[in-house]
């Protein structure tokens, strides 16, 4: 599998760095239509509120492969996609594990993409990004889920800044089976 280049290298390759597009959001949009997010390749209109997991699935379907830089975490970006674009390709059960084995209660989730080259213990230093049915955003790092944001729009703003602050370990909330 070919790895995606880092965020800064992508900006240089596409010429965006010299155009001064560090600010990822357009200030000229009203919240009615959504946020105009400056993707690495071209602007992407992201709904200001994605109401449900179907909205996340549609976002991934529509913008698969696009890179979105984070406003307050410019060294990283979200690469929109599913497991197929990650080091976890072929591990379809991973989503089910994240839904059932990490949080205090089972929660439906959708994979929205990955963040590459994060200094962490994840395979290939690649965080798998998931959105829960309540809107919260999590990062999967080996046997750990990190809560990154309370909403997808907050995540697009802060990126991975809160990595490690709220952590859930695999099986932490599963009751011990006593024989």
Swiss-Prot record:
It comes from the Viruses. Residues 1-32 are annotated as: Disordered. Pfam families: US22 (PF02393). Residues 1-15 have a biased composition (Basic and acidic residues). This is Uncharacterized gene 87 protein.
């Amino acid at each position: 599998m070919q790895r995606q280049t880092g965020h800064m290298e992508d900006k240089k390759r596409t010429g965006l760095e010299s155009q001064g597009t560090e600010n990822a959001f357009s200030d000229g949009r009203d919240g009615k239509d959504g946020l105009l997010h400056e993707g690495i390749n071209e602007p992407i209109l992201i709904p200001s509120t994605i109401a449900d997991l179907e909205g996340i699935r549609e976002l991934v379907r529509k913008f698969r492969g696009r890179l979105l830089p984070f406003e307050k975490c410019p060294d990283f970006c979200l690469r929109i996609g599913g497991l197929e674009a990650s080091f976890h390709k072929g591990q379809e059960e991973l989503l089910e594990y994240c839904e059932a084995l990490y949080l205090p209660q089972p929660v439906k989730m959708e994979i929205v993409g990955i963040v590459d080259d994060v200094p962490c213990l994840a395979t290939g230093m690649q965080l798998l990004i998931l959105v829960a049915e309540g809107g919260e955003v999590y990062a999967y790092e080996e046997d750990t889920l990190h809560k990154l944001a309370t909403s997808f729009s907050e995540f697009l703003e802060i990126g991975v800044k809160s990595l490690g602050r709220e952590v859930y370990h695999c099986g932490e909330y599963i009751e011990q089976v006593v024989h």
